[in-house]
Amino acid sequence: MVCVLVLAAAAGAVAVFLILRIWVVLRSMDVTPRESLSILVVAGSGGHTTEILRLLGSLSNAYSPRHYVIADTDEMSANKINSFELDRADRDPSNMYTKYYIHRIPRSREVQQSWPSTVFTTLHSMWLSFPLIHRVKPDLVLCNGPGTCVPICVSALLLGILGIKKVIIVYVESICRVETLSMSGKILFHLSDYFIVQWPALKEKYPKSVYLGRIV
């Protein structure tokens, strides 16, 4: 009986420690000012990549190096990213010396894939996402809704929970989402440090979100 009580007390202490650890990480926003910030951008097929690149176009060279994460079968996004970086360098010669990298992970969900089966594909994607996040150790993760961003953001959160590095997660909901959040948005609303919406109707439904008007 005593052993059971001791084990229960130990388990309770561990649980309390983990809860406090998560709370501290989620609430901690202390970022040391630096000349540059490493940014990891999650790009998705179709309009997601177009929107996120428009947003990146307004950011300064201080966000460097830039790490892009795309699905392993998404060649269209890879081409758009390469074109964006080349155009950026042509417009401003100083951009020629900033570095960017493209990383690939498996898709969390293929087109027309059943939702129950996405549990396994997402876990597989997350299994490969954490080593990537651990290697890159970005200061900031920026995403706007592709399914690939879920395992990336969860991995970034785990990096902080484990005490390795606090990563700021910024989620920008797609301009196409006027009254309802995307599935990725519903998941990451509670995990991101800044959750940005582009329509006032979403701001009313989700008061904790940030509304800056249309930004892409």
Curated annotation (Swiss-Prot):
Keywords: Congenital myasthenic syndrome, Disease variant, Endoplasmic reticulum, Epilepsy, Intellectual disability, Membrane, Neurodegeneration, Transmembrane, Transmembrane helix. Pfam families: Alg14. Belongs to the ALG14 family. It is a single-pass membrane protein. It is linked to Myasthenic syndrome, congenital, 15: A form of congenital myasthenic syndrome, a group of disorders characterized by failure of neuromuscular transmission, including pre-synaptic, synaptic, and post-synaptic disorders that are not of autoimmune origin. Clinical features are easy fatigability and muscle weakness. GO terms for molecular function: protein-membrane adaptor activity. Part of the UDP-N-acetylglucosamine transferase complex that operates in the biosynthetic pathway of dolichol-linked oligosaccharides, the glycan precursors employed in protein asparagine (N)-glycosylation. The assembly of dolichol-linked oligosaccharides begins on the cytosolic side of the endoplasmic reticulum membrane and finishes in its lumen. The sequential addition of sugars to dolichol pyrophosphate produces dolichol-linked oligosaccharides containing fourteen sugars, including two GlcNAcs, nine mannoses and three glucoses. Residues 25-216 are cytoplasmic. Forms with ALG13 the active heterodimeric UDP-N-acetylglucosamine transferase complex. It comes from the Eukaryota. This is UDP-N-acetylglucosamine transferase subunit ALG14. The chain crosses the membrane at residues 4-24. One of its GO terms (cellular component) is UDP-N-acetylglucosamine transferase complex. Its main location: endoplasmic reticulum. It is found in: Endoplasmic reticulum membrane. GO terms for biological process: dolichol-linked oligosaccharide biosynthetic process; protein N-linked glycosylation. Residues 1-3 are lumenal.
